[in-house]
C-alpha cells in the first residue's frame, strides 16, 4: 500500500504488483509443499465448507476450536457428508498446516497390504518388497496429521497394532526389529456405529476410547435443507441458483431424502448442467431419475425423532399439538385439521394450508 494526501484526505493505493507477487508466492509455497510432502497435502479449508445451516455452523465452530489443539478427533456421519473435507480444514487451521496431511482409507486398502501400507516394511520383508524398504503412512505423516478414514473397516489384528502405535507414538516396520518415534495428530472417521461393532465383537473398545477423545458428528444433507441451494451454487460455480428452478423442482429437491448426501447432490448438479435448457427454469423433467422417481412414488420426507422435534419447537408446543391430535375412545380425531391450523396461525407460526 502507498499513502497519498489529497486536500487533507489521506487515501491508500494498492500496488497490484505487490498483490500479484504475494499470490505468486502463495502458489509457489503450495507447489513446494506438495513436492516436499510427496502430494500429502490438505486441499480444503473451513472457508470451503458451506455453513448456511445451524447444524453445520455448530460443528465447524467446535472444529475450529479443536484445530488449535493436538487432541485426537473422531468424525462420524453418513457416507458422503464431507468427513475428509472437515479433517483437511482442521489440519489447515492448525499449527501443523505446513506439514503433511496423509489419508489412509481402511475400506480401500486390501487386508494383506494394510499393515505394510500403514507401518512400512524393510527390504526382504516379503516377496516383492522394494529394495531399501518403504516408509509407511504414519512415517510420512511425521510432524503432520494422519487421517484414518473408514476406521470401522479395520480388522481386529490391524486394530491391535494401531492401538499400540497411537499409545506409544512409535512404529515398527514389517520385517524390522527397531522402532521409529513419530509425532502425528490423529483424525479418524467412520460412517459406522462403532459402539454397535464393539457389541458385536468387531471393534476393540480400547481403540474406540483412544480415538474418541473428541467426536464431531456431521449431519446428513436431509437435515441441512437451508444449505442445499447454497451448495448447488458452490458446486456449479455460481451458474445454478435457487432462482434457476421451478417451485415444483424446489419442492422435490427439498423433500428428497438424499441418501448419497453431498456426493449425490454434486452428481445432480453435473446432471443438470448437461440436461438444462438455458431458456427456461429447471423443472422435474431435468432432474435425475432417482430423485423424480422418489417424488412420483409419493416419497415421504425424512421424519425426525420426537427429541429433534422438541429441540426445535419446544416441549410445551409439541405437547399441546399432541393433545390436539389425541384420539378419543371411538378412534375419532378430537380436533379437525382446520382447528390445528387456526391454533398455529393464532400464535403466528408458519403452517401449510
Annotate each language-model stretch with its function:
Residues 52-55, 96-99, 175-185, 193-298:
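Nucleotide-binding/hydrolysis machinery
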Residues 59, 81, 104, 118, ...:
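Conserved RecA-like P-loop NTPase ATPase core
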